[in-house]
Amino acid sequence: MGAKESRIGFLSYEEALRRVTDVELKRLKDAFKRTCGLSYYMSQHCFIREVLGDGVPPKVAEVIYCSFGGTSKGLHFNNLIVGLVLLTRGKDEEKAKYIFSLFSSESGSYVVREEMERMLHVVDGKVPDTLRKCFSEGEKVNYEKFRNWLLLNKDAFTFSRWLLSGGVYVTLTDDSDTPTFYQTLAGVTHLEESDIIDLEKRYWLLKAQSRTGRFDLETFGPLVSPPIRPSLSEGLFNAFDENRDNHIDFKEISCGLSACCRGPLAERQKFCFKVFDVDRDGVLSRVELKDMVVALLEVWKDNRTDDIPELHMDLSDIVERILNAHDTTKVGHLTLEDYQIWSVKNVLANEFLNLLFQVCHIVLGLRPATPEEEGQIIRGWLERESRYGLQPGHNWFIISMQWWQQWKEYVKYDASPVVIEPSSVLNGGKFSFGTAAHPIEHGEDRISNNLGYMNTTEEKYSDNISSASEASESTGSGFLYSGTPGADMCFARQHNTSDNNNQCLLGANGNILLHLNPQKPGAIDNQPLVTQEPVKATSLTLEGGRLKRTPQLIHGRDYEMVPEPVWRALYHWYGSNLALPRPVIKNSKTDIPELELFPRYLLFLRQQPATRTQQSNIWVNMGNVPSPNAPLKRVLAYTGCFSRMQTIKEIHEYLSQRLRIKEEDMRLWLYNSENYLTLLDDEDHRLEYLKIQDEQHLVIEVRNKDMSWPEEMSFIANSSKIDRHKVPTEKGATGLSNLGNTCFMNSSIQCVSNTQPLTQYFISGRHLYELNRTNPIGMKGHMAKCYGDLVQELWSGTQKNVAPLKLRWTIAKYAPRFNGFQQQDSQELLAFLLDGLHEDLNRVHEKPYVELKDSDGRPDWEVAAEAWDNHLRRNRSIVVDLFHGQLRSQVKCKTCGHISVRFDPFNFLSLPLPMDSYMHLEITVIKLDGTTPIRYGLRLNMDEKYTGLKKQLSDLCGLKSEQILFAEVHSSNIKNFPQDNQKVRLSVSGFLCAFEIPIPASPVSACSPIQTDCSSSPSTNGLFTLTTNGDLPRPIFIPNGMPNTVVPCGTEKNVTNGIVNGHMPPLPDDPFTGYIIAVHRKMMRTELYFLSSQKNRPSLFGMPLIVPCTVHTRKKDLYDAVWIQVSRLASPLPPQEASNHAQDCDDSMGYQYPFTLRVVQKDGNSCAWCPWYRFCRGCKIDCGEDRAFIGNACIAVDWDPTALHLRYQTSQERVVEEHESVEQSRRAQAEPINLDSCLRAFTSEEELGENEMYYCSKCKTHCLATKKLDLWRLPPILIIHLKRFQFVNGRWIKSQKIVKFPRESFDPSAFLVPRDPTLCQHKPLTPQGDDFSELRIPAGDVKKVDIQSSAGEEDVLLSKSPSSLSANVTSSPKGSPSSSRKSGASCPSSKNSSPNSSPRTLGRNKGRLRLPQIGSKNKLSNSKENLDTSKENGAGQICELADTLNRRHVLGGSQPELVTPLDHEITLANGFLYEHEACGNGYSNGQLGNHSEEDSTDDQREETHSKPIYNLYAISCHSGILGGGHYVTYAKNPNCKWYCYNDSSCKELHPDEIDTDSAYILFYEQQGIDCAQFLPKTDGKKMADTSSMDEDFESDYKKYCVLQ
């Protein structure tokens, strides 16, 4: 595509320069510098975008770039100039040589036909027929022959048509002058263009303070009040807000300031009249006059001390006197003219006008017209502040006296003092804005209660300057003129202007000329007032610097003080190198407001972890604990000044925002010494109370990525060297250190720790009497011992936090899946913890064999009692007593109706949350009648298609489905039309809108004559009255990229055949779609450009339109249709409304339409009809009566610049009405569910799918079935797990559904299986005592566990250990009564857990035992072969195998499960049985009857059973994203107070502060239980010797730890 060097060697750079003027060359150089920066080369991308424009086809642009000499390095400026001169001012001979060079060979001496045809195919897509004449004599031609042929065939191809035929369409310079936004505003106001440019910067800074993004009354009010009274703020806002949209745009504030401050007196009084005309009816009623008088008297009292008669008169008398003297209509009100006559000589009205004058300049940013005016404005503001006195919470600013005196001379400031009363710069003294000198006292520092001086001006303003420039509607030099005074003052902040000032005071002979007019001062220089900081650290606060203490600064001699509004104005007008804000506070002793000049200067340290060596490693399996040989290094990072009255909480919040660190991830420590730090955790303490003085060191601690705290980890690592300081705390209110993403463990431990019966069991040491160190599936008692030691520390009441090192190590040893530093599932850890505690404390040391029988139609109570008895024979512990309940699971065959029932134990209920099966969609409907768009809210199925969306939306908005066109709008244009058969997408490139389109009618032949009535009524503009047999003509042509809402009769060929070189000619013979796309467009002018086509670039804005257009639509109809839709955006003011414009010279509405329609391509930038080399922005559509043949093009609505600047209401673009369905759908989407609904869903009947066929023992085959779970027995401690992590559609997702649950008196009895009281009998079903040696199971009645092996991998299906059985983890094969719950969608080989589970848990490991997880497909088959072969083994083998595999699996780190078929097979069911509860109410486990509770009576048990009411005592909450996030616990202490356990932090809080929305696990305790009844008797029992356990632990501990 061209050579690497320029092909324009025939035109030299020097010759090209002679053809451009100096002005043009400077513009080109500046444009090149703006585009390329300091580089001498322009990239190809910049060349295409900035020089040629986006309308040139990419292939053509690439050819031109290469022909100019562009390479991969770029295009040199000299080559660019030569190329531009050739294109715009080259001679035909030179252009012919250029075209020849494009096709010539490397040598440039001839053109080869094959090469030329190849390039023409690339550029034009075809080869002209006349080309064969050029090569009639051979395959090569020289320049002469090529030139002769080219001049005879100038229209042969694109380049020849562009450069040789039809004249020049692009020039080097564009002399047209489109008015800029500022020029337009300056033409209709009394403001200069420079004033408007300067005012715009201020406007965007003020608007940036809005919370809504609009300059509304909520934003405007605090800015002007005080000094404007709140009663007048709304009226003043309305006076600016001409279009009454509750938003002051820049045009309105410019015109309002012009009318209020720069116009003649009569016009200024007009503005005041609008302030008092509340109802905007053009007159002041009696009520409005009374309110006006009240407001004016308040203004007078605030600003003047003079006495006037009106102060002593009755309000009604004043109103009557005004009406009697000036009411010309004699109807009891004042017109505008009446008000003007009254206000001319009225002192109250004039004083109000003076106040507005001050506010408009100081607050709203208008620059004073003269220095004298500036001095009067500032003086008036300071006089009023002197009457108010110092107000706590306000900031005052220090200004160097040297600059202040120079400014006073410049503005001719009156030197008489302005006294502020009371003054508190000195204790009880007064200060004035005069020359009186007062020293600063050093004895008592004055401090700020405005944290960090966040309201100061300098930083906030500098951060927002860019937004002001971006808002400008002209680019290049249109916004900021570097030579204007306003620009210099706003951006030249750092230079010292004293030299300039001295020069201004010297005459030509060197004599001082003090009598001359003083020179305008430069930027405010406060540097002499502050000390040079020796500490080189970043300051986090904006106090500006520490004031000098020596020599002593004296007020009135060294500095002056001004209130914040005055400082902002001076800063805006002059700039400053240093802002010195100082706040006003109340003295804690005298309660007198005072100004703090010397706030506390604090030094902040940050941790810098030391580099670890191989010897100083981290703890293996323990967390990120550093070595004691590598202590944490702390370095000075920041400084900051804060008030002594500031609380720790306020400082913490400020630092969090300033450093962009989450509050929960940062803590503050008081640094006393290297080894003595104090955590500042009491947020209500003030610096004064803590006796924190200047230059005190504080440590900013930030969490590690693994959620541990560096200081804590360092303390743990050095705990042998540093004495732990005992701090008395509430028992149980002790946190747990995060050892590296162990918040999941801490949360579960805290919940279990606050289970009072279990905690009392451990605190009393009873666990040491029941340690089972011989249990093959236990943990040798280590789990119980470590947990017991930790509980005793937590409830000792001597430590604020402890590190659970031993328990963490024990868990990691026996469950490696919890090892490492990744976030885990708190529920999984809880299950493992309870399981480990149970096995270590199991009172059954030799487990007997039990038999699992089929229900065979037996009563539920009998089967349940049998299952419970079987479990109790093998499992007895404090964990079983407290946490275990029983579930009934029944499966009903849909073929024969046979019901199979089994009962399983559970220790927590896992309730699947209903996943969001609906998506919430809000869509805006835009109608053709121009009414305000309406937003509708819908709830759609997740797989809903746009067809269904149309139907639902049609029912809401009243349009037929055929009238709705969906479009994705992005960057003010339509990017895509979704097809009806596509699924609705929430994440689209833009936002989805629904446009109304004309109803398609029956198709009409384009060739047949159509009789139409072309007359149109004014209401329809002739757009919808064209009929053929009473119907609208059916659209039969669909342009490229448009939706097939209507059936096309044409083909795609109609479109593509018409495209030649990017040129789309008119297609008058092609039918239309019935509508076309219209986009709003404005021209953005730049003064730095390369070609005339790029001086004014189109820019799209606003919302695109859908305009009706058929084969019969006239051009005038298009204008009418567009105006109908946009008139609400550009409505002229009501004729009776007084305008704020100084002179309304806007004639944009004088003609019919304030815009012009042009035919453009889909991108809206270039013409759809003209070829690219014409550089046409769109052919104009005349507003005439002839037909509008638009074809498949779009139209651009080009707004007249004056109308756009003065009449177009940008804020109205975003105005939509919200239909009631929006709130309804939002509420439905976010509506929480209650716990009862979760339980109801859990116990509801479900149908098993075809992939979950149930093997029916009656039908002897797999059948379809239904399944139902029910609660049979509830434990004293009920744990409810809300399954937020679920596997849906192949991926893990977290449900954010809010679940409402009761805290007190939770009654789940409605979900218990009803009992038949006639069958209840207290019949012993188990032998008395602990000896089960005589219990044997016949071999013929049991089935073996099927062990499936595949590729060397072993999948063993086992029973869960008793404490690991959750309600939803029912461990039976598909179709069995205990198969997985319907609502818990699962993934293969994964347990019902979070995706944070270890890979060891989720996958198969060779040589390891793997347990099937919930929903797993790897379950025991129900096939007949398995059933038959399983009869060979006996129950003894089964139980032996189960115990062995359980032990091996626990040691491997996973939770065991046993899954066996119910029919004819054994299941090691974890059920309880009490002899007396075979038909009990099932409300509670009550007390065990076979070992230590023989003395309990049946009456006590019956009482317990009759109260299944629970109270909440602990919550584990998960916040954040899936796969991460954070766990915290809320628990109720025995002192009846709630505490928040956030790792090592434990704080008391009010119950209403609990974050219940993120609840994950709920812990309920049954009302009325006696903790003592669960404590076993230790009489006659021997405490276990744990010395060997300690030795074992220490031995293993040292293997994993490098600490000594």
Curated annotation (Swiss-Prot):
Entry's localization field: Golgi apparatus membrane
Keywords recorded for this protein, A-Z: Calcium, Golgi apparatus, Hydrolase, Lipoprotein, Membrane, Metal-binding, Methylation, Phosphoprotein, Prenylation, Protease, Repeat, Thiol protease, Ubl conjugation pathway
Sites of S-farnesyl cysteine lipidation: 1601
Modified sites of kind Cysteine methyl ester: 1601
Composition bias type Polar residues, residue spans: 1360-1370, 1415-1424
Keyword flag Transmembrane helix: no
Pfam families (UniProt xref): DUSP (PF06337), EF-hand_5 (PF13202), Ubiquitin_3 (PF14836), UCH (PF00443), USP32_N (PF25265)
Region span, Disordered: 1353-1432, 1484-1504
Residues recorded with modification Phosphoserine: 1350, 1372, 1376, 1454, 1588
Cellular component annotations (GO), alphabetically ordered: Golgi apparatus; Golgi membrane
Domain of life: Eukaryota
Family stated for the protein in its record: Belongs to the peptidase C19 family.
Name listed for the protein in its UniProt record: Ubiquitin carboxyl-terminal hydrolase 32
Gene: Usp32
